[in-house]
Amino acid sequence: MKKIIGLVGIAGVILLSACSNSDEALVISGKPWTEQFILPQILGQYIEEKTDIDVEYKEGLGEVAIMTPALEKGDIDLYVEYTGTGLKDVLKEESEVGESSDSVLEKVRKGYEEKFEATWLSPLGFENTYTLAYTKDNEYNAETYSDMVEASKTGGMVFGAPHAFYERKGDGFDDLINTYPFVFSETQSLDPNVMYEALKNGDVDVIPAFTTDGRIERFDLQTTTDDLGFFPKYDAAPVVRMDALEKFPELEDVLNELAGKISEEDMLKMNARVDIDGDKPEDVAHDFLVEKGLIEK
């Protein structure tokens, strides 16, 4: 049995305060964007296939500032978070340059257990982090950020990013160029919704993209690797209330069966199916689980 409740933003908080979880259901939620509509479906459908647990979905609940208190209060039991987000945005801790995935995971696991009575399970296998993307027409032949620095020194390279990227502290534009000494001829502040079109149309030459964004593949963009480890790790992993693990003793082992099963390419392709082809997240999730042999058709 599954129930689906669509909640967005502040309205979601109001509704959450008015109604509590079903006592017998595991409540899975996500943030209000494509990847976070797909991932709850992957987790939920797999749980339903492998256990007798009833699953309730609360879709598109909000960003991390809403998800964290909802998890802490028990309004939701489970969602997928990214280790770097948990470390920087929730725990307000810094990641060391080049810090390993295991180290970041251990920090967030310890912090969430102490502060929120929730824990992080094994990562799903992909990281959704920043990459510097450019069109292949530019012929920079850059595979790493350091390669892009060298290409920028030839002149004429225009960088475009959302306004928020220029304002971010710790892992925004100013800190980026302190680590990587780019020589941009111009920087532009762009609406995130038009950033890829600006790149495709040649209005800018380089943008900070997310590694699992389906438009990378569909627009045939070239991506680069953060070779100096400037950005923290953003490994995707299930975050679950510890009392839910007690209530459903089989849950932890079942969720950990998904560890390492979703590659960056898998996630990118699934996002593209929803964002570009218009497929439903639940159908994309089902197809993925079937194709990987994780559930029956």
Where do the model's predicted regions map?
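C-terminal motif of bacterial Sec signal peptides marking the signal peptidase cleavage site
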Residues: 15-18
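Bacterial signal peptide processing site
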Residues: 20-22
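Bilobed "Venus flytrap"/periplasmic-binding protein-like clamshell domains
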Residues: 25-61, 126-196, 279-282
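An extracytoplasmic/periplasmic, membrane-proximal ligand-sensing/linker region
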Residues: 35, 166-171, 175-182, 250, ...
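Short helices/loops that flank or line small-molecule/ion binding pockets
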Residues: 46, 65-76, 92-94, 174-179, ...
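Beta->alpha turn/N-cap motifs
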Residues: 63-64, 74-87, 104, 135, ...
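Ligand-binding "clamshell"
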Residues: 90-100, 108-121, 203, 215-229
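A conserved helix-loop-strand patch within extracytoplasmic ligand-binding domains
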Residues: 102-158, 242, 260-264
